[in-house]
Swiss-Prot record:
An example Gene Ontology CC term for this record: small ribosomal subunit
Xref: CDD domains: uS7_Bacteria (cd14869)
Biological source species: Rickettsia massiliae (strain Mtu5)
PANTHER family the UniProt entry points to: RIBOSOMAL PROTEIN S7
GO terms for biological process, alphabetical: translation
Protein name: Small ribosomal subunit protein uS7
């Protein structure tokens, strides 16, 4: 059953330690089965590990990582005349941060370190220095958008 009105966006409160909404969303993405305290512990412990190991500001490292991984273009599938085309579209800021956090978390969970704290700390530090699996994912997304540039005239925004 369709909605009469668009769903309202939930207001997400900023995290307690750094007063950041982006970090709060990142913690929510780490969270599994409603265990927010555990997710916060993982993120803040990873921040402590970054601070001790690399002697840099962990919050600044996190912001750099998110900024570096955030994509500017992605492809969306558009059906035109019985054929599906991969059309490059711009990514708005909120979706960009959502994709970046998802890619960083997935890349971290696939790393070989034993604990998620170590995995996350390493992946965040690498992403802040434009290295790592999450950066590769962003570059692949941009390459895909660049390869399908010819279909940009099928942009879904123009078709409505």
């Amino acid at each position: 059953m369709s909605r009469r009105h668009a769903a309202e966006k939930r207001v997400i409160l900023p995290d307690m330690k750094y007063n950041s909404i982006v970090l709060s969303r990142f913690i929510n993405n780490i969270m599994k089965e409603g265990k927010k305290a555990l997710a916060e512990k993982i993120v803040y412990s990873a921040f402590n590990k970054i601070e001790k190991k690399y002697r840099v500001d962990p919050y600044q490292t996190f912001n750099n990582a998110m900024h570096n991984v955030k994509p500017h273009l992605e492809v969306t599938s558009v059906r035109v005349g019985g054929a599906n085309y991969q059309v490059p579209t711009h990514v708005d800021e909120r979706r960009g941060y959502a994709l970046a956090s998802r890619w960083i978390i997935n890349a971290a969970s696939k790393r070989s370190e034993k604990m998620m704290i170590d995995k996350l700390a390493e992946e965040l530090f690498e992403a802040s220095n434009n290295r790592g699996v999450a950066i590769k994912k962003k570059e692949d997304t941009h390459k895909m958008a660049e390869a399908n540039k010819a279909f940009s005239h099928f942009s879904p925004k123009k078709m409505k």
